[in-house]
Amino acid sequence: MKLKEVDRTAMQAWSPAQNHPIYLATGTSAQQLDATFSTNASLEIFELDLSDPSLDMKSCATFSSSHRYHKLIWGPYKMDSKGDVSGVLIAGGENGNIILYDPSKIIAGDKEVVIAQNDKHTGPVRALDVNIFQTNLVASGANESEIYIWDLNNFATPMTPGAKTQPPEDISCIAWNRQVQHILASASPSGRATVWDLRKNEPIIKVSDHSNRMHCSGLAWHPDVATQMVLASEDDRLPVIQMWDLRFASSPLRVLENHARGILAIAWSMADPELLLSCGKDAKILCSNPNTGEVLYELPTNTQWCFDIQWCPRNPAVLSAASFDGRISVYSIMGGSTDGLRQKQVDKLSSSFGNLDPFGTGQPLPPLQIPQQTAQHSIVLPLKKPPKWIRRPVGASFSFGGKLVTFENVRMPSHQGAEQQQQQHHVFISQVVTEKEFLSRSDQLQQAVQSQGFINYCQKKIDASQTEFEKNVWSFLKVNFEDDSRGKYLELLGYRKEDLGKKIALALNKVDGANVALKDSDQVAQSDGEESPAAEEQLLGEHIKEEKEESEFLPSSGGTFNISVSGDIDGLITQALLTGNFESAVDLCLHDNRMADAIILAIAGGQELLARTQKKYFAKSQSKITRLITAVVMKNWKEIVESCDLKNWREALAAVLTYAKPDEFSALCDLLGTRLENEGDSLLQTQACLCYICAGNVEKLVACWTKAQDGSHPLSLQDLIEKVVILRKAVQLTQAMDTSTVGVLLAAKMSQYANLLAAQGSIAAALAFLPDNTNQPNIMQLRDRLCRAQGEPVAGHESPKIPYEKQQLPKGRPGPVAGHHQMPRVQTQQYYPHGENPPPPGFIMHGNVNPNAAGQLPTSPGHMHTQVPPYPQPQPYQPAQPYPFGTGGSAMYRPQQPVAPPTSNAYPNTPYISSASSYTGQSQLYAAQHQASSPTSSPATSFPPPPSSGASFQHGGPGAPPSSSAYALPPGTTGTLPAASELPASQRTGPQNGWNDPPALNRVPKKKKMPENFMPPVPITSPIMNPLGDPQSQMLQQQPSAPVPLSSQSSFPQPHLPGGQPFHGVQQPLGQTGMPPSFSKPNIEGAPGAPIGNTFQHVQSLPTKKITKKPIPDEHLILKTTFEDLIQRCLSSATDPQTKRKLDDASKRLEFLYDKLREQTLSPTITSGLHNIARSIETRNYSEGLTMHTHIVSTSNFSETSAFMPVLKVVLTQANKLGV
């Protein structure tokens, strides 16, 4: 592709690679005249600015010269480290002179720009080259076999490489070797090339073509291989490029014959040895691979010959060519588009002439109209293979399982010599392990699980614990695997039996030292109201109780006693006891604060009296431990857990461990843990983990630990998984609970842990820790990837089912001809990943389908089955009679029941619509969700199941199986149904069609009151309801009825059958075509299975009222403006009719979005995302818009966006494709 051009008949030279910016020097060419026949000569320097889109190059300086040039080169001699304009321009003149110029002075505008000049040569100097190893050495060639080596440090006295070759001849080209600094080659028009060794000052080899027709016009050394070079021939009889290897100089190594006429110049890229430029008399510039002879690129040039061609040293993709038409052109081999250049030429022409007639009439002309080039785009393709400088020498990529895949291109020396190198491609796959401690601890956990050595594992963790809390956690976990776990829990809480016995014994010794003795029962009853004997007995134990009983009852074993029946309290109690009235006696004792007597009498009075007495006692007693005693006696442990101060959580947990029954133990521990977790104190929140360990609640332990600990590091996750695995094993062994059920949070943590293990290369361990009985899609996909990465099924693990179904979609083809026998399709299962809901009824799952494939036929919901037969079972449907459309109520049509397969054609004269995919059923998993409840169910609740991905959705059609879903409105149908876009968003139901599907007839599923003059339909008397009809009926059916104007935003496109067959809609039976608009279909309500007549009685319906739409709020009006403008731009750029149909349908279906904006029913998140999409459209960043679209769909409610987001994606995709 052409980048720049300079109108000069001149020789050219690029600035050295170290120089920035890039300059191009031009010197007036000798023996050539421009169009002005000027004899003046000049030396100019131009700057290459690729950021400027114009073709003109900026001229930096011009120096008027008295010389015209045969050769011009720019050497890097005296180039400073900063890359400033320096070096030296070396020019070969007409009269054997070599002139050295200072380019920095030329650009600065100085007059004294000549560094040195020498006229030692005889005749014009046509060959010049700079040694790339010693930049002060310059080789030159002229007539009479003159070759000089110039030292720029001592320019006055050149040296020769050796004796002149005989016979004397002109030196047409000269070149230094690119690998060996003392090797020089020269060539002459006779076809002979001589290789010189400057150390020996003699030629070492001569290369010549045996045909003697090789007129050498170009010479170039291989950039990498020191012994290879190419020679170009300008003879039209032999327009070839010969590649020679000096080790086999008897014949050319390879001959390139891509030019039709003689070659004038060649240039070998220093950046890529596989790119060789050549230009010839056939007006072609070719870029070839000299190793294979293949033409990789042909530059788009004009019909003029090019006599010089050069690569840019700094930018390897840029080259320049000087042609005989007086122009130097700059090209890029990376391709591009020339549309901009053509438009610039048109603009230049238009700006020159203006709006006046260029032929002198003086009349103004209309603006210049450029014909639209719709089919042809001037795209210039790049090279067939990537050049070396953009090919990566090395590369790396991580793959699943922690594997690192690297490649490198290694050059190895060949067997023929050390200089010859061959490129080898190596690919290495290595395992990358970054978390060694994480893997080590994971292995220890696996060994503990496999060996069942949980106690030893927990003890190691206790010994290695660095915090007291960590030590307590592992101690609690260890107790689960020991005997008497509750007693061990109490010891961990600080309640050891031995220590408690010592404390009690010490307390008893203090009591004995004070000589406090209990002498009789009255003293016991009246000793202390607060600290009752019952509480003391509870604390001192059975041994003290027995001693008390002996001390109380032994003194009263003999003698007589008085039974007093006086009027005091004792007398009343005596009378109540003598009459057996225990309840009154207890009440008297409680009244007299004789608590012990009351409780002892209540025991004699029965359990009910004892319970009431205990409650009254606890109500009167107000000691510090009364509530604890109450809970112990009444066995109300929930009261302790719910009401205790959380600072005493250890005491509450100890009480639960001591007294709670096994069936309520876990719930009480959970309750206490929940209280601790909800407390604001972080220390108490962490202690909740101990309660959950006692309860064996793994899910809550995960939640609490995640909240309390930092989980960003892999080792933090390892800490949690260790505790979870050990606790699950403990619960499984001790509590006989089902641990296979995994909660959502635990499944997420286990999945994250398995991902980390897989990333470190532990595939088997990742599979072992991954939950088995969960239906979460991400876990199912991870298990599938792990099994595939392992390469073989794991022992004890069933190979997981692929969480998606592979389908081979047949290419679209025309449907069968009408009248051909078609077997009905059998329902096929569609698999949805576990945990995901199927698409709602009628939603189109867009896929990569053939646009020519016909729409898919829906299956009647009344005939759905949850069991699918393994083989197709033909059950042809009898064709149903066509039915009319109208407004009001549900459709009167009911699907026909399947009948036995007939012996004749099941579809007489009925065309069948084929589909790109055979979806007619649904998965057993979701079949029950879509079964129709009764034949009278409304269309809004009786949609067919969703088609599989890649299938279209066709409503109705000739020969389609009956369906109770909504039907497309055929042309010419009468009625006053309001447009779908005029209805509020909340009233629109029904399936969302594909872009090329007939729109569904939206109905509100309401039962309307039947009119009084309604006539029931005639029962069905024939299995086929007028399939053909009489001629009069057909003539009436073809007459269109008076159409009722609908909203322009809800026009119904006419569908087409495959193969270009038009779809004429569903024809109406006789007598229904010319029906006035006031008539509509009645809603027939009846018992399931009631017969339906073959004629339909129409009754007058209520007149419909047109709904006036609200205006779109001002803050959202930009959305409609932006989306409609984008669709119009796409329509103007689209050339494919199918694409235009997509965009037309998208424009209509975006009305759903505008209605929701009018009603303001969209959530703020969705509206904000839509505004972001609109901003990306304004900046034409459609990729960002598609990313935002995916984010909105994945994070929002599906019911809010299903009506318009799919078509918005279609518009963005088409805009990105069309580049509007």
UniProtKB/Swiss-Prot annotation:
Pro residues biased stretches: 869-882
Region (Disordered): 791-908, 924-1096
Post-translational modification: Monoubiquitinated by the BCR(KLHL12) E3 ubiquitin ligase complex, leading to regulate the size of COPII coats.
Motif position, ALG-2-binding site motif-2 (ABS-2),: 842-848
Cross-link Glycyl lysine isopeptide (Lys-Gly) (interchain with G-Cter in ubiquitin) mapped to chain: K647, K1217
GO biological process: COPII-coated vesicle cargo loading; endoplasmic reticulum organization; endoplasmic reticulum to Golgi vesicle-mediated transport; protein transport; response to calcium ion
Expressing tissues: Abundantly and ubiquitously expressed.
Key word Electron transport present: no
GO cellular component: COPII vesicle coat; COPII-coated ER to Golgi transport vesicle; cytoplasm; cytosol; endoplasmic reticulum; endoplasmic reticulum exit site; endoplasmic reticulum membrane; ER to Golgi transport vesicle membrane
Annotated stretches, region: Interaction with PDCD6: 800-1113
Protein name, as recorded: Protein transport protein Sec31A
The species this protein was found in: Homo sapiens (Human)
Gene: SEC31A
